[in-house]
């Protein structure tokens, strides 16, 4: 009995300690000692119920038994509660969109509509007038049933005064013009009974001024007067009311309305629960997670399982997404919830998720670990980054090991200078956040650029939570973009830590930004600037890599940035480069990155085109050096991680790869090529979506054999089968259709990959023969890239003749659709123009249709017809074995055994 008593007492003391920790964390955000997630959930439930009761009482009194009908139209904005303790929806459409909201912020009373409802009360929204009247009476008197005095003074600012006063009269009220600006004039505010604001309002520190008026007891009615467009002024006014503007487009697409059939009970229910999800809170408190999901409905594709078709799962996921969106709105605005009034419930959500993270253990399985899986699924969506203190997630699974937890951070401010290479994108800062440790960041003058900071670069598919026992890392490693204002410090704490990225838009390409960071950790980071001596940067990188104190590294070279697990890079260096880091870095720059951008003909700083390319451009009067026409594309990011967004490698920006980073690798150049391929160089659009990108690894493999004697991927191009398909197809009554059916008709993503590649290599062999120089063969694709960018961007009338489009009045289309001939046409014209031969016979040989306009243009050149040809080979990289077959008189025998 005594032992039992002592145990109970110890547990009680522990619970009390957690209560105290929770009370303190609600003020500071410091959840590092908070481990009792159930305790936090109970407190959250109590707070949610208090909010529901307050909302229910207010809304029930406002609605009475009046019509709920309301239609703001498509040209309107959503107005959302931001601080849930003190704000609430007033009108929620049938699609769940908030069309008007109420505010009790700062002890005042506010109401905001997503359209100028005051101009609609005598027309489309006449039925809404009685409800608006009660709402205004509540604003002015604090009681929706208490009539406003006759000639109560209304100050109208930023919206048409006459229309506003007439609108209030249409609602059955008797307003009088205050004839002064209660927003900026304190004496006017003291005598006015209502302030009506529109998007035309202005004041110094607008949000703070609105809040001050509210706090002083002046009721505020805001009407959005900017249609479905967002408005900076509106956003500031709403922020002062504790509300927020909806996303771009507002109600334009949803056209949400409150139907006349809506009941008072239903509206009260919707408003009371909005943004709180009491049912989800109840699940968390009770641990009553659903256990009967039909996981057999999940599907798998290239190694990744998805469960979108599991009945009921999407509803659960959407509810969690709503919660995530509400909290991320604060992250994105760099607002610390623990410093904002009216956010107790949101703070409790964050602290609950923090406490859950203290106890997460990987891996988990959706079927075998039902409760843990679903609880973690919710907690993963709830992260508060902007705060002075927080907690680290103790186990990070396949994302990072224990050494990330113990990385030392800087105790003093570091100054970093970053160059923004394009108008928008993101770039590595060169530092990282350590889990649970406070980091402060600020930027100095950014010019006209808008800046934000982000952590990590993984796409959501890099967490394979639906795969069997593969929920083995946090679900949202990449943070939202957190806004940065010039010379204003933002404090961040991440439970996971991660690589810091500067996100930018509206920048002047080439401009520099100074970033100041305190409390950051240093990962191995290599920054190679074109044309600069990088020897010290390389030495520092090698030293950091050899120290082996980080799980992640970054490398920036030209237009490529690599964000990689150290083991994925270290493994390749040791296995493929004998531990020679210098050689690895040199080939990363020259063989992988430079090779691709040079082949595509971009204007690379401090690097001239080859004499052969320069001569071809000069002869044709082409502008091949313009940094406007041929500017390097925006930064290509590469994630090298345990998992990819799709399969083992997944294109995009970033592109993902799961294998070790190898400068000579096929997959690296294949994925990079996806972001360099263009519609004008595709045969049948998407039918060569996995083909036209492969000129980049093909060129690299040819170069690696020639320069290093290593023969890689030597069976990639299937000349033999391509030839066989052509021979069979041309035996039909319609040869072109016969070959098309065999070679191009199959829409499969990877269909006939090696055979279709043979078309692209034909022209390398042809150009090498034409120039009598095997080293110039690949120049044809550089010239075609230079050609297509001029077709795309140069002054059409001035340059079309020089580009071989003299008969085209308008710039031709650029469709990537498989049914289009846009790419076929451009290839026919470009190749005929460059080779000074009519290449229609060879295009027909390959089953490639072209338009009448393209054929007429080629005929207008007056070039000699090039008889149909086929370059045969039994190797991919060795071009000395290539044999030319004349296809104009039949189908010669295959020239290899």
PLM feature spans:
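Exposed low-complexity, polar/acidic, P/S/T/G-rich flexible segments that act as propeptides
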Residues: 498-499, 505-558
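Activation corresponds to long, low-complexity, non-globular regions
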Residues: 250-392, 551-571, 579
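Catalytic beta-strand/loop cores that center a nucleophilic Ser/Cys/Thr
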Residues: 18-107, 121-122, 163-173, 181, ...
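Beta/coil-rich, acidic/histidine-enriched accessory regions frequently appended to metallopeptidases
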Residues: 314, 347-350, 358, 362-404, ...
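Active-site-proximal alpha-helical
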Residues: 273-293, 299, 308-312, 562, ...
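Short alpha-beta junction capping motif
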Residues: 103-117, 129-138, 146-155, 187-232
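Beta-strand-enriched, solvent-exposed domains that form extended recognition/catalytic surfaces
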Residues: 380-525
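Catalytic cores of extracellular degradative/oxidative enzymes
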Residues: 541-769
